[in-house]
Amino acid sequence: MPTAGIHTVTVPGAVAGWEALRHRFGTLPVADLLTPAIHYAEEGFPVTEIVAQGWSNASERLSESPAAAKTYLIEGHPPRTGEIFRNPGLASSLRRIAASGRDGFYRGETAQAILRLSNELGGTMADADLEQFEPEWISPIHTTYRGWTVQEIPPNSTGIAALLMLNIMEQFPIREWGFHSAKALHVMIEAKKLAFADLLRYVGDPKFSAIPVETLLSKDHAARRAQGIDPKRAAARVRPSHLEGYTNSSG
């Protein structure tokens, strides 16, 4: 599985998800819901420091695509902290959704633009992939963290990693150390490394592979993983845990 390029692109599901949520739980028309987003896409917003850093890290790759450079770079450079970023193309796409609902995205001008670019880059997406897309209603996974229940989206999303991180962090006296103390930050960073090592090792599409969700979210598993954190040294390389009977589902 490549890490970049057209073959990493799946059928976009957000718009269908918004529509399903609105029909089930909402009362406002989609045009009202999208008005603020359209405003910020068209008029712009100041870029925050962390977003500017992420943009800077991706600037070389964005520069390789004329369309991406035109959309996401400002006069050839990534948006800097405090600069106003505008995305009029996104505003136009959102207006079509506001006017026609999901058909304003999965059919018509936006859909054809998606398919045209996919074809140009050697992708395999077809009209039917967009027109027939349906979101899935799923049951969340959860853990507890110091008495609080925390829910996340189940695999094949990465939500399980956040829950595993919390379980590992629960093994340490974070509050006693102070939330922004060096000790606490060290444990948070190392817990993230451990959680993502297990994520990449065991989590894939549940339609095609068995995923040990209960085991990964057990407190015993977190306690064992926490033992791998050196309190005085950052791990240069983190190995996934070994769970008997499971193989690498992510490829």
List each language-model region with its residue ranges.
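Noncatalytic scaffold domains of N-terminal-nucleophile
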Residues: 1-107, 111-157, 174, 217, ...
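Internal maturation/activation junctions in enzymes
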Residues: 76, 172-251
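Flexible, polar/acidic helix-loop-strand segments at domain edges
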Residues: 160
